[in-house]
Every structure is written in structure tokens, then in C-alpha cells.
Amino acid sequence: MHEIILCKLGEVVLKGLNRRSFEMKLMSNIRRRTQPFGKFKIYSRQSTIYVEPVENTCDIAGAYAACKQVFGIIAITRALPCEKSKEAIFDTAKTYLAGALTAAKSFKVESKRADKTFPMGSIQLSQWVGGALHDALPHLTVDVHHPELTVYVEVREDAAYVHGPAEAAAGGLPLGMGGHAVSLLSGGIDSPVSSYMIAKRGVQLEMIHFASPPYTSELAREKVLKLAQELTPWCGRLAVFIIPFTEIQEEIRRKCPEDHFTLIMRRFMMRLADMLAQELRCRALVTGENLGQVASQTMQALAVSEDVTTMPVLRPLIGLDKEEIVKIARKIGTFDTSILPYEDCCTVFTPRHPKTKPSVEEAREYESALDVEGLCQRAMANREMIRVKPTF
């Protein structure tokens, strides 16, 4: 028998009558992600998705790494199926896990008997296989509390499966089951992390980025596209809509008080993101805002910036410390790109003393000096859409 991948389901098992649609979507996502590594048979049984190679040329290691990044899988392991007999299970464990068993000093066997027709109980099977392994490998001691290695045996309806400890996978919900949203993507640390966290809840994303040439460089643009590409293993295929923002920022600088520059700029960003979301039939906006992290992210300022939207604004980072955000950025592979020293439009015309407790009435009054509708229409008319090539 060939080695296979076992993908353990997370929240999907709690979905009741909708569970099957979540499983089908998850299997579709796994199929898409494993396609570059060969032909695999993908099916679901007993709260586990099986990824089984059809050809000897399949890259099982590559498929395993890809599956670890698929949302909806809580744990993952490579396993070897065998005949459902205690002798076959022992032989498989001894050969398949030979390297780990040789390296370990202590071990235990943990069995699960999903097939209740199997003649031995779970504890009996663990004791028998553990005893046989101990006899075959005398250097091993049995430690049921703190073993260096746990040998797992799963007796299912179709076969028995032997594997070592499972690894944590991406968790969350299958991508595409949580709706469709527009995510505001800057060149910083926060917005890629917020995009990842919302995608983890099953939301398919479109990205919007605001560029202000000549104040922002071509390198800043390339940085954002690279960030989007680094998100594709988690978020799937992405389109980045680049909105020209120079005219809007220059008009704000000319006609609005300096302490309101950032706030009114944010309101324009939210307007434009809302317009794009409506056009694409998205149901929410996603930002990397974090309560109190900077002066423009007070509770009052957040309320003023979202005053111009027609749909929910999702802020997954709202209660995280910066250190927590950085940790996630490192985990998903965006941190090194985020800290490249290329300025984005958020750093253009930054006020010396931004307003921290603004009001909607003030913002609307200052915006009355601007041709809000005309500025937005011209920006949207001159936008650019770039489909980011996935890294998988």
C-alpha cells in the first residue's frame, strides 16, 4: 500500500446540516492545491479527508506541505495503510516508523478503533502492538505519560493506518465558504496579517491598494504585489486593484486642516473600497486597523472613517498587540517584505499633530470643500487590476 495524507477536520465537523457543503469545498481546495504535485484521490470518511496518490510519481512531500496551508484542516499527518490485523499493524509500525523508533528512547502506542467489528479493543491493541515493538526494539522503554514518540494506530472500516504525531495545520474554515470581501492592502505589517486572518474564516478576498506617484515609488508598488503573492498560499488566487490616489491627497493637502489630513484620507480610502466592493458584489471591507496603535486608530477616528461605508468593516487585528501581529506575519511569510523601506501613500503628507478625537460633523464640514464624487470617480476610472500569480 502507498503512503497517504490524513487531514483532520476542525470546525467543519460542527456545521450540522451544512457540513457536507463545507467538506466538499474543502476537498475542492485541497484538490486545487495538490494539483502541481501529481494526481491524488481525495475523499472524506469519518471526519478525516484522505489525500491518496494515484501514481508512483506523485510528490507526497510537496502535497503534504501544500495541505498544511489549506484552511479547514486542523491537523495533518502522513500515514501508511495496512491490513486490519494486529500482526500487519505491528509490521507496518516497525518498518514505516523505523527511523523515529530507532532515535527514540521511550514510546507508547495509542490506538483508535473506529471499526467496531475489529476483534480487539483500543487498549488491547495498543498493549499488544506496544509489547511487540518493545520485544523487537529492546532499547525502547514504554512511557505512557511522557513518551519521546507516540505511535498512532487508527483502525477504520477500509484499513488500518499507522502514523507518528500529527502536525498542526492552518485551522479555520474552507476558503470560499465565508463570503467575499475587499481587503485594504498597504505595504506595512498589519494589512497582510488582517487579510490572512479573514481568509482563515473562509472569506475570499479581493485586494485594493492606493498608490500616490511620484510620492510613492515603483518599488513600493512592487512590494505590495509581492506581499499579495506571499498571501496566495493561504488566500488563493488574488486580484490587486491599484487606485491612483495622488490627486485626492493633493486636494486634501490644499483644502483641509492639517490635523485632519490622515482622517479624511482614510475616509476616501473607505469610500473607494466600498465602491469597488459594491461593484464586485462583496459583502464587507477588511482593514489592518488596530485600536490605539497609532493616533488615527482611536475609537472616535475609526467611527469617523467608517461613516462613509455601506457595509461592515472587519478589523481582525483590533485587539492584538504589535508583537502578536509580527509573530503572525513571520509565520505566514510576509514580515520580511513588509519591513522593506519603501513608503506607501499612508506616509505621504503625514500631519505633525493628527486629530485623535474627531467628529463626523467636522470631517463632513472639511470635505465639503472637496469635489468628493468627482475625485472618487476619476480614481476609480483610472484604476489598474493585476492578477497575482500564485506561488504554489
What positions do the PLM features span?
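RNA-binding accessory domains that recognize and position tRNA/RNA substrates
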Residues: 1-182, 192-238, 307, 355-360, ...
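Active-site adenylate/phosphate-handling loop in enzymes that bind or generate adenylated species
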Residues: 131-133, 139, 166, 171-178, ...
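Structural beta-sheet core signal
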Residues: 183, 207-209, 242, 287, ...
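Small/polar glycine-rich anion-binding or flexible loop at a beta-alpha turn
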Residues: 293, 341-349
